[in-house]
């Protein structure tokens, strides 16, 4: 979010003032040269304005919750649908990785607020293609189930049946602080959004698992949802708060009541075997096998490197002690590193950084051996 100003109020620093200065400067020359200078200056000004607009127009990143079936529809054949949205609207748009056993994925869309709003409105249209009002599915993950009832003819008497069938829903993911900003004092803002754009808006009671985010369900015609998202973006950017950044975001993951139900994490890197990630009592866990010969380099002198990694990722990293020679070691070539954390993304970050450090050490060793 590079700027919190309304795009309509953006000042254009290179404009009439430069042209007037140019005109007054050229008073001492012929009228022909004045005209030439002015046209060149105007052309230069236009280029500067376009450049400044591309830099200063506010940007935003919205996240939408989708089911696996909806995700497949958004991606399209060989990624054609999502690529089309990306190219038409000039946005960065993508989906979170599939997590084993999870029925949901998160769609992220970042760019200029107008482009993001149009993109998500287009996604609503894509999801409604070939479906009807009564074709809603039921999901075990209740956040995917609609909160609002389907639209009826009584509510939209001025619309045809075909138009009513185009009414769709967007599950916008917002943090608790963002939701308060959208609702406004005494619910004034959300009421204005509903009435002005003729949409229904409701927030989920529950927070998404292990996060400070809730679902803001918006129901309406795609164009209406686009306009609502544009207004919501402006509200959030104008009330940008430090608490927005510190609130926990939701990432698809399994929750389990016993260690036997595990979430598979990333595949191995550089020959390192990655174990399962168990979620139990609000704690995520990742287990890595690091080759014994690299443990010292990964841990650092007096454990400083691993200590810095713990601090940076806000995780607990436990290095398994070397087994006594009198005990039979089932895996003498590798040492186990266990990563524990309260947040899934922190554990994933620590895991990826450990693997990256290992890759660096492997390359260093290869270089040294090549020089000998």
From Swiss-Prot:
Region of interest (Disordered), ranges: 1-49
Q: Which UniProt keywords apply?
A: Chromatin regulator, Chromosome, Cytoplasm, mRNA transport, Nucleus, Repeat, RNA-binding, Telomere, Translation regulation, Transport
Gene Ontology process terms (BP)? chromatin organization; mRNA transport; regulation of translation
Determine if Transmembrane is one of this entry's keywords.
no
An example Pfam family from this entry, by short name, is KH_1
Parts of the chain that traverse the membrane = none
Return the GO cellular component terms, semicolon-separated. Answer: chromosome, telomeric region; nucleus; P-body
Q: What is its main location?
A: cytoplasm
**CDD domains (alphabetical):** KH-I
In what residue span(s) does the KH domain sit?
59-123, 167-232, 283-354
In this chain, composition skew of type Low complexity spans 24-39
As for subcellular location, the record says: Cytoplasm; Cytoplasm, P-body; Nucleus; Chromosome, Telomere
The Gene Ontology terms for molecular function here are: RNA binding
Q: Where is the composition biased (Polar residues)?
A: 1-23
Q: Which PROSITE patterns match?
A: KH_TYPE_1 (PS50084)
InterPro entries in UniProt: KH_dom, KH_dom_type_1, KH_dom_type_1_sf
The family this protein is said to belong to: Belongs to the HEK2 family.
Function statement: RNA-binding protein involved in the correct localization of transcripts in the cell. RNA localization is a widespread mechanism for achieving localized protein synthesis. Involved in structural and functional organization of telomeric chromatin and regulates silencing at the HMR locus.
Per UniProt, subunit arrangement is: Binds RNA.
What's this protein's name? Answer: Heterogeneous nuclear rnp K-like protein 2
From which organism does this entry originate? Answer: Zygosaccharomyces rouxii (strain ATCC 2623 / CBS 732 / NBRC 1130 / NCYC 568 / NRRL Y-229)
Protein encoded by which gene: HEK2
